[in-house]
């Protein structure tokens, strides 16, 4: 190819890129090196072993994550720890409780600020996914959890008789919803966690008969898929106090897959941070184990793992020091929680979202609200029922570090998602949310 041809091709490309930027906004097309970050923003899971198995230090932001496993294996517990991590970093999380089984007291024990957590208990699968999409495109949500895919019942099935056959309805619903949700997640930096159950295929003689409901779309759209199982019961004497849990990363688009992590889940406590630190530090020589004794530097942590765990629980500075050494050894960033997504950038590039109405009782509200707060208005409002003068910001939760131009505090949130507009008009046809305090 001659030099003149090369120059003409370069000019034609620059002209095309300029036209695209004018029509769709700056950054609609960019070179890979411009778009690539030096690191991936993540949400810690609460288990340092699982953060390491994921390869990037936690659940990637702006992606879809699927967590599946048998009953009582720790799926919801894991997501509640992720919610607590987001809230400690000053972010906003939402929980779509399609199973109507969320326990606020248990969530509080795991470190979740239930006054700030947005909760929706939708009437149908369509309503749940529509609310999820509207929250994501509001550009104000950092993490949204859908519990669970199996409970997203299509409206046609709810309105039909008990014995009616509805072939493929849920799979088609999930496929359509994921096509819409995926683009919004990438533009806003929101992470969506789908909890899923297990089913068994009939007549399978070779390979695993286990499968997950909701069709195959979620398997393709998910950047990370986690298979979580109980492997043994933790006992003190004859009393069961928790479970040893194993998580296998069966799919990972951001790091090598098929790694495994094990950690302790204690009843009423959740994932034991201290037990995880002990296991990891012993494997890497940070904590020395002599017989049944655990020793860290000049400190004797205790005889037996339970005594060592209690020592770290009572001496937080020692636990923090061990954790920082592990993070440094593994190459994780010192700021484990990462930076919150640039919500202003999401506002500038967010796609056009028409005003939509969501009917029924599944409007979003906070867990501290009265039962009547859950009765949805037709516009699908987001309501936080705490008074702006009542209730302090929980310990360990910093102020919201979101760059969206809005007059809002962490104590009062009242947004009309369906017809919201922003003071600054974004590039293209995008619309955003103005939060009113």
From Swiss-Prot:
Region ranges (Disordered): 343-437
Gene3D superfamilies: P-loop containing nucleotide triphosphate hydrolases
GO biological process annotation, one example: DNA recombination
Compositional bias of kind Polar residues: 350-371, 380-391, 400-426
Pfam family of the protein (one): RecA
Described function: Can catalyze the hydrolysis of ATP in the presence of single-stranded DNA, the ATP-dependent uptake of single-stranded DNA by duplex DNA, and the ATP-dependent hybridization of homologous single-stranded DNAs. It interacts with LexA causing its activation and leading to its autocatalytic cleavage.
Name of the featured protein: Protein RecA
Organism encoding this protein: Tropheryma whipplei (strain Twist) (Whipple's bacillus)
Taxonomic lineage from the root: Bacteria, Bacillati, Actinomycetota, Actinomycetes, Micrococcales
Gene: recA
């Amino acid at each position: 190819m001659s030099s003149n041809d090369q120059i003409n091709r370069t000019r034609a490309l620059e002209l095309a890129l300029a036209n695209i930027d004018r029509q769709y906004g700056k950054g609609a097309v960019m070179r890979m090196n411009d778009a690539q970050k030096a690191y991936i923003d993540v949400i810690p899971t609460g288990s340092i072993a699982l953060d390491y198995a994921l390869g990037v230090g936690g659940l990637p932001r702006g992606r879809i994550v699927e967590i599946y496993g048998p009953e009582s294996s720790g799926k919801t517990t894991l997501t509640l720890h992720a919610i607590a991590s987001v809230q400690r970093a000053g972010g906003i999380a939402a929980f779509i409780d399609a199973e109507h089984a969320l326990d606020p007291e248990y969530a509080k024990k795991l470190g979740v600020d239930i006054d700030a957590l947005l909760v929706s208990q939708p009437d149908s699968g369509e309503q749940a996914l529509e609310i999820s999409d509207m929250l994501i495109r509001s550009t104000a949500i950092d993490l949204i959890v859908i519990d669970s895919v199996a409970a997203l019942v299509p409206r046609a099935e709810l309105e039909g008789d008990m014995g009616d056959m509805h072939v493929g309805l849920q799979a088609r619903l999930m496929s359509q919803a994921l096509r819409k949700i995926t683009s919004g997640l990438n533009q806003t930096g929101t992470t969506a966690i789908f909890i899923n159950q297990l089913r068994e295929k009939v007549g399978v003689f070779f390979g695993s008969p286990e499968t997950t409901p909701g069709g195959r779309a979620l398997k393709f759209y998910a950047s990370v898929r986690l298979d979580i199982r109980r492997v043994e019961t933790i006992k003190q004497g004859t009393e069961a106090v928790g479970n040893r849990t194993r998580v296998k990363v069966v799919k990972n688009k951001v790091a090598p897959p098929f790694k495994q992590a094990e950690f302790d889940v204690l009843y009423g406590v959740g994932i034991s941070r201290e037990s995880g630190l002990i296991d990891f530090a012993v494997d890497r020589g940070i904590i020395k184990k002599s017989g049944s004794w655990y020793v860290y530097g000049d400190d004797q942590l205790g005889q037996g793992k339970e005594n060592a765990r209690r020592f770290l629980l009572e001496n937080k500075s020692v636990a923090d020091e061990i954790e920082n050494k592990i993070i440094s050894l593994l190459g994780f960033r010192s700021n484990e929680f990462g930076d919150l997504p640039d919500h202003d950038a999401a506002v500038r590039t967010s796609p056009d979202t028409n005003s939509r109405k969501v009917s029924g009782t599944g409007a979003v509200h906070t867990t501290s609200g009265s039962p009547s707060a859950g009765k949805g208005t037709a516009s699908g409002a987001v309501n936080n029922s705490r008074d702006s003068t009542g209730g302090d910001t929980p310990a360990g939760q910093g102020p919201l570090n979101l760059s969206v131009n809005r007059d809002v505090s962490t104590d009062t949130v009242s947004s009309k998602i369906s017809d919201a507009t922003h003071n600054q008009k974004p590039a293209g046809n995008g619309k955003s949310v103005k939060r009113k305090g």
